[in-house]
Amino acid sequence: MDGIHHMHAVHPIFHATNGFLFAGALSNPHQILSRDPNSNLTPKERTQEAESDEREEMREKTPKRWVFAFAVGFFVLFSIAYSVENLNGSPKVRAVNLGGWLVVEGWIKPSLFDDIPNGDMLDGTQVLFKSVTLQKYVSAVNGGGSYVTVDKDVPSSWETFKLWRVSTTEFQFRSSSGKFLTCDSEGGSVSATAESPSTEETFYIERNRNEVHIKLLNGTYVQATSSNQLLANYQGVPGWDSNAATFEMTIAANGLHGDYQIANGYGHDKAKEVLTKHRKSFVTREDFRFLSEHGINAVRIPVGWWIAQDPSPPAPYIGGTLAALDRAFSWAQTFKIKCIIDLHAAPGSQNGMEHSASRDGSTDWPNSENILQSLNVIDFLSSRYANHPALLGIELLNEPSAPGVPLDVLVSYYWKGYQIVRKYASEAYVIFCQRIGNADPMELYKANIGDVKTVVDLHYYNLFDAFFNNLSATDNIQFVYNNRQPQVQTLNNANGPLVFIGEWVNEWSVSNGDQAAYQQYGNAQLDVYNEASFGWSYWTIKNARKHWDFEWNILNKYLLLESSSSNQIPSNCLLLMLVFGCLYLHHIL
């Protein structure tokens, strides 16, 4: 479209020039007669001579016109084929996420966690305790808020406790209702009644493989009594035989490996060493060169809320992400790549996942204190990068969950965040991520959040849902065309924010897919996601799981960026368009 506009803007100038120099002389033969007032030719001979001069002049000009027409036609055709509307004359966003870099995700680079002592007992790990003498599970009655018993044969949520790690051997236990186990004195009973943990809620864990002893900080051991109580009154030091102070510990889940887990697991000094090395090596200048050479024009950079307090963020977070983000902007400017800053991890966690730096899987973001702190982070980032030529946009929050984050709370936050960005940057896009979970895809389009350069981000994975588990390669491809494409088209036509597929991946649950199948699947996704009015961003640049790794996919030709049909106009159509364009231009010039 920009090419067409450019042609129309240029054409009248050239046409007027030709009209003045050439066409004007040809359109009125009497002007030619007036050039030689002393001529003895008859009027008929003069007319014939003028026509002969005109034909000679046309023969001289025709080759030049064809060359010019071909050049302009090719430029227009190239612009039509490789430019798009709706992004102020720029190409659509073809981006890659820098996931796992400034916000840690253990599954992206598991080796980061290799040297943590008691590495299977990180913050958020869910554990069960079973008395070896009673063969009953420890249970927080009603999930917490009351006393603790040792009387359940089959464990459920009441018997599941989340670890809050204090040190390698010291822990606090959070019940399913959010209350902490507490014991205020030697000989006292253990209850699940504390709102927040302190000394009385901290216990030592002595471990012998899957067996543990639990004791208070004063050294008194907890035991399961014959009356099914949990009391801090065991006499002496228990051995590892069958006794009332010994419990079998089962790890029910330990899926959280984020910034909180790595920093609190190693402790500050070792975590700083590990993360400093990671931030310097995981994404480098050469990665930006690679992206640029393969047609990527933007990066989406996840950051955590603690970046605003760099270089000395609150414990246990480790400083250094701000300097790394500055480097990314510098590299981006060098290679003409744009940056989207994405608040991926908000205080309190907006979704309970490791990539939001959740401590224990809880979604505690939606309160006034955390929301205000998040807005302060947006203010910090906007003021710092508003005038940087590499800034493309700021995403106010990544993947808030439904129903954990109520829509009205989210919309209010987005509106305030939009105003903050606009205070500093009139040209930056403000990006609102859809809620994940059970949410209406149209809900943000109905919310009327801002009216200038706004974008809605949605994430598409043929994963994370049992629906996709048994789909074949063909089924997955058809799902992209039959389900994703209509939704993208509907959102494109919603007369609201632009549409951004901010995360997608060339991976699925197909166990036997070969290279050709992955190529077809990738092509299908590119066909559809290229239709999004703002563009797309692949998740992620590097990953221990190769099909999630953008660079691996490109180098091994499992993802072919230039082969999707939406990136191409068939060659015969190109040729026809070029011919007709040149004929038309030659005619009007």
Task: List each language-model region with its residue ranges.
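An active-site-proximal structural segment forming one wall of the substrate-binding cleft
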Residues: 278-296, 317-344, 357-393
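Lectin-like carbohydrate-binding module/patch detector with strong preference for beta-trefoil
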Residues: 119-253
